[in-house]
A protein has these predicted regions:
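Extreme N-terminal starter segment of soluble prokaryotic enzymes
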Residues: 1-3
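Amide-forming acyltransferase catalytic core, primarily the GNAT-like/NAT-type
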Residues: 5-8, 12-55, 134-266
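An N-terminal, globular interaction/scaffold subdomain
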Residues: 41-43, 49, 63-76, 111
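Conserved GNAT-family N-acetyltransferase fold
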Residues: 51, 61-63, 81, 86, ...
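Acetyl-CoA-dependent GNAT
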Residues: 56, 65-73, 264-268
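Conserved acetyl-CoA binding element of GNAT-fold acetyltransferases
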Residues: 77-90, 267-279
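Conserved acetyl-CoA-binding loop-helix of GNAT-fold acetyltransferases
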Residues: 88-108, 280-293
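Active-site/acyl-donor-binding loops of N-acyltransferases
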Residues: 112-168, 224-225, 234-240, 247-248, ...
Length: 357
């Protein structure tokens, strides 16, 4: 018999250092994620943050949830959960454990859930159980500034995957002689690795998307990352470690007055612009070359249509080549109906758990 157990903030605290946790064959959450989930300003004391599936005393699977809020134009707020992690042990496949975890989450969050960054097989499962509808995907552009064949080729053919270390050596050999093609602007900017009053005062006055990120959420994102550059979580299948990782705000000024800011993450030379607030989006586009050069960025991924259009129009960022793809979203039928047919979702690149991975 499969039993589903849910952990809220209080129950999750100290879980990764408990004796029970140490006995698991696989880790259902990392230490950093535990701390971050508990600190989430949008998680209530009653929210279930981690669902565990047991058969007897044996852990068979888990589902991690990131609580959030979304608001209609009239101000009505709906509390919901983003799916963050879902795993079932290979030893226990075929017992409908994933479905049981999904139904437990659906009940705990009153049918209000969303999912992104899922595999095709997971998409099939989510659709099969009948709880979810597809949302319009976000179109993405990945800009390559250096040779990154070790990232591109292994996904195309197994022969490249087997020889990945040699392809990586080729990348390292050729990249020093490949120049950055973009020209840096003369815009005045500063970098903030920590939340400050200037950012708080500026962002709290800006127009937000329906998830209405405020200074509390942005401070949390900066202060409680999920990735460590020191150690990897043992027996954990999701992101917990990166050889290099930074997150920071870029602040742009005119006449010493803050006019634009955007939140960046750089993981292993891969730049993402997670959130931005700007009076003129072209300022972000022309400031990016300086960030790309100063942080030795190899590639950049942007899911924001407006920013991608500005980059294409302004030609401020010049790439060796580009790849086009999309990010899919699922929403429970219940939440979709509550928000209404005319609701504009307008997800930022960092919404969901994307700011942390």
């Amino acid at each position: 018999v499969i039993e589903i157990v849910g952990l809220n903030k209080k129950q999750l605290k100290g879980f990764t250092t408990s004796q029970a946790f140490k006995k698991f064959e696989f880790a259902p959450i990392s230490e950093l994620r535990e701390v971050s989930h508990i600190a989430n300003p949008r998680a209530t004391d009653d929210d279930t943050l981690l669902f565990l599936a047991y058969e007897g005393e044996e852990l068979t699977g888990y589902l991690g949830i990131l609580p959030d809020d979304i608001a209609k134009p009239n101000g009505e707020v709906f509390h919901f959960g983003w799916f963050s992690t879902l795993y079932v042990s290979e030893k226990h496949r075929g017992k409908q454990i994933a479905q049981k975890l999904l139904y437990a989450a659906e009940a705990a969050y009153n049918g209000r859930m969303m999912i992104t960054e899922f595999t095709d097989s997971a998409h099939g499962l989510y659709k099969k159980i009948g709880l979810f509808d597809d949302l319009e995907p976000k179109q993405a552009v990945r800009y390559y500034f250096k040779s990154n064949l070790a990232e591109i080729l292994p996904a195309k053919k197994e022969v490249f995957n087997r020889n990945k270390k040699w392809i990586l050596r080729f990348d390292k050999l050729i990249n020093p002689v490949i120049p950055y093609l973009s020209k840096s602007s003369k815009l005045s900017y500063s970098i903030a690795y920590h939340w400050d009053d200037e950012l708080k005062n500026f962002i709290d006055k800006q127009t937000k998307n329906p998830l209405h990120r405020s200074s509390k959420e942005f401070e949390w994102i900066l202060k409680y990352p999920w990735l460590s550059t020191q150690k990897e979580q043992a027996n954990y299948l999701f992101s917990s470690y990166s050889t290099s990782y930074q997150m920071f705000w870029v602040k742009l000024y005119e006449n010493e007055i803050l006019t634009t800011c955007f939140l960046c993450s750089i993981r292993n030379s891969h730049l993402k612009v997670l959130y931005y607030f700007a009076d003129d989006i072209s300022k972000i586009a022309i400031s990016l070359p300086a960030i790309i050069k100063n942080y030795k960025v190899k590639m950049m991924t942007i899911y924001d249509d407006q920013l991608n259009e500005e980059l294409a129009k302004g030609q401020s960022v010049k790439a060796l080549y580009k790849r086009y793809f999309k990010r899919n979203y699922l929403i429970t039928k219940t939440l979709k109906q509550e928000l209404g047919a005319d609701f504009h979702y307008e997800f930022a690149d960092g919404d969901g758990d994307f700011s942390f991975t």
